[in-house]
Amino acid sequence: MKFDFRRVDQLPRLAWCATLTRGHDSVVVHHGPWVETRDDCFFEAAWDGDFRAGRFDEAATMLGTGARIDGDRIVFSTATDTDFYLFSVASGDTLIVSNSLAFAMVQGKTSPDIRHPYYLYDFFALRRTGLTRDPRRLRTADGKRLNVHMYQRFAVNQRLDIEARAMSHQPLPVSFDSHVATVRMTMAAVFENAAHPGRRYPFTPITMISRGYDSTAVSALAAKLGCRHAITFSTGELGYDDNGADNAARLGLSVTTSKQFDFQRLPGHPEAEFCASNPSGSGMLIAGLSQQLEGRILLKGDSGDFVWSLSEIDAARDLRRPQIRALATASMNEFRLRTGTLIFDVPGIGAIHSTAIHALSSSPEMRPWSIGGTYDRPIPRRIAEEAGLSRDAFGQEKMYGANLAGDEDTLKPETVADFDRFYAAANVPWSFRQRHRYLRRDTLTRPVDALLEYLRDTPGAAKLYKRFAPWLMNVTAHRANDWRRLSPYLYLFHWGFDQTKARYEL
């Protein structure tokens, strides 16, 4: 097998799309200008291993994606977190693989199915069921097979046979010190790889920080490893001030403070690429930071909600997230491909061992760092306090930094108007347009809410919750927010694709 690289400077910097044809040993790869290419591999990635060796497909932690020749096969590698995927479209004698859902659809000559508004819940189902159902198929307008590959390495030969490859993992944590040592060593290795002088385009770290547990702990670790700059937002989703600037200063970090809705000042429809990445589009608050994030590793703490949680429900195997209700980071993919940004979800290091990490959080060793209440995470608290932050400086109240796409107060007025035109002209099923189909589902939402709340709060019922919650949530189109008034905005994914596809038309 061999690569036929075709650089296209007009593509987003980190985007790539590989075309494999049955019986041919040459794989055509169209790619943006920042994708690193070698005779035997290509990647837009940093990993916890030697850069020159290029064995990212053996790494336990990998930011970004890539592919490498292994004899008579091409091995494709996804990111090792659960927010960024590879997408494949199979049609006849051709297989398309890309790190962009829009790119895969355009080159696969397909598009979202306008008869299917529920892509949001397809992605929720992917996260809620984890590795127990991978890859997951998405519907397309013409019925072509489009798969989403999460936390996966897979090999493809000339016959287009696909073979799953084993993933590498970090060691099982047995104590706080061993867990944090693994996280710290992994971060250091990734930073070294990302800054290697052999790169045409190196990456340097920048960290998100708020007053919450996870981003504060991540920033404390990053500061000790040479990270010098942080980003914070001054207002949370519900009007709370979640500004982490004071803590950033205490950690020795310079900080850029942005208001949550600054992206609304941008021209055009900056929300579109977020909606095209993931139907929630809720990571759009970073749209106004594109210049600050060029050539950066953006450090985030999102998966701390699960990995560092004390809730037994969150201690799920196979990277399942039974009660996940937000997909903010997953909606940032098109943005990061365009700006040239790698995203590092630090609590996700070793997340495959979430049951062991949960046991550690609940252990006697960690009790001095447990403050009680519903918002209590001993591991990130200990990390931050041992870095010099006071107990009352963070982790006091859960706030939400992500925006919910589909709210007229969130989207730009110009975007709302453009979406309304798209929705009015689209061949949306009559039953959905009249909301009959949605309301039929919604009649189940309240009793399902009551059942899930009972299972969540009943001692000993966590196993039942983890088993049945993902299925119940998706059958009822369950969402934390009131989708009865937002249901047309489930079509933001279709609109986002329509707005974004031109960047991938070669």
What are the residue ranges of the model-derived segments?
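ATP-dependent adenylate-handling active sites, centered on carboxylate activation for C-N bond formation
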Residues: Q158, R165-A387, G401-E414, P459-K463, ...
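Long, acidic, intrinsically disordered low-complexity segments
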Residues: P33-V35, A45-G49, A53, P322-L337, ...
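PAPS-dependent sulfotransferase catalytic core
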Residues: E312-I313, R391-K463
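Charge-dense polyanion-binding interfaces
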Residues: A102-Y118, R127, I371-R391, F432
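Membrane-proximal basic amphipathic "stem/tether" segments
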Residues: M1-D25, Q434-L506
